[in-house]
Amino acid sequence: MVEPAVLYAVAAVFVAVLLFLAVKLRGGQEQQPADDGQRRGAPRPRTDAERAAGAPRRVRGARQRLQAARRINQQDSEGDSDSDEGRPEIDIPEGMKVGAKKMKKLEMKAEKKAAREAAEQEREERKQREKMLEEKRKQEEEEEKLEEERRAEEERKAKEEKAAREHEEYLMMKEAFTVEEEGHEEILDEDATENLLQDFIDHIKAVKVVLLEDLAAQFNMRTQDCIQRVQELREQGRLTGVIDDRGKFIYISQEELQAVAKFIKQRGRVSITDLVESSNQLIHLIPDTEQVIRVQSS
């Protein structure tokens, strides 16, 4: 049987342990609320607005302007891309704080600069266009001047060739048309030669059909010179007609040639026989007696 003293000792130890545990547990609960109170009482971090509210007025105003400028820049960057392309770029040093008013001034300054540059570019482009137009005008004037000089040179050469040809023809006519009197030849001047040549042409037109040998004798010419003269007049267009194989020249006027051409055009296809049969009506071969007398008397 256990002694009472031992039981009392065990009970005392058990009670002491219980009291220790109870005190320990209560102390932990009181410390936790105290810690919570300390944490709740500790100052929390302030926001930008709270810091700005507690800052001096000047610093607070500068910060507000900077924030407004940032918001404006952010809104501009989020705007339409087309408006961004037309907005001039503003060079702001890195780290530099710019307010809204300052930013507006910088934008206006940049816009004026861009406008000046655009106007300057427009002036340069206009100068280039005017320069090109002036060069083109000068080139056209130079080409026109060269063309006029070329035409003038061609006209001058044509006149010289015509004068030389007329002089040569005059020499040939002067050699062909001579008047033999008392064993010597009288050389005609230019006017007399031209008059005699006109009489020569008028006589052929009046007679219509002339024997070249008789024509040469009538105008005191060699037959070969007379034939050559008729051919030259035909080439010059002063006589129209044909020379047959018997040495006759048949004069055909321009009106008669047009009548023959009209006849052929109306008939479409014309045989030689039809043309010969109709030639008496289209071409008049009867001499003009009055004209012949007038030429011979001149």
UniProtKB/Swiss-Prot annotation:
It is a single-pass membrane protein. Residues 1-4 are lumenal. InterPro entries: DDRGK_dom-contain, DDRGK_domain-containing, WH-like_DNA-bd_sf, WH_DNA-bd_sf. The chain crosses the membrane at residues 5-25. A motif (UFM1-interacting motif (UFIM)) lies at residues 176-190. Keywords: Endoplasmic reticulum, Membrane, Transmembrane, Transmembrane helix, Ubl conjugation pathway. One of its GO terms (molecular function) is ubiquitin-like protein ligase binding. Residues 105-140, 147-166 have a biased composition (Basic and acidic residues). It comes from the Eukaryota. This is DDRGK domain-containing protein 1. It comes from Branchiostoma floridae.
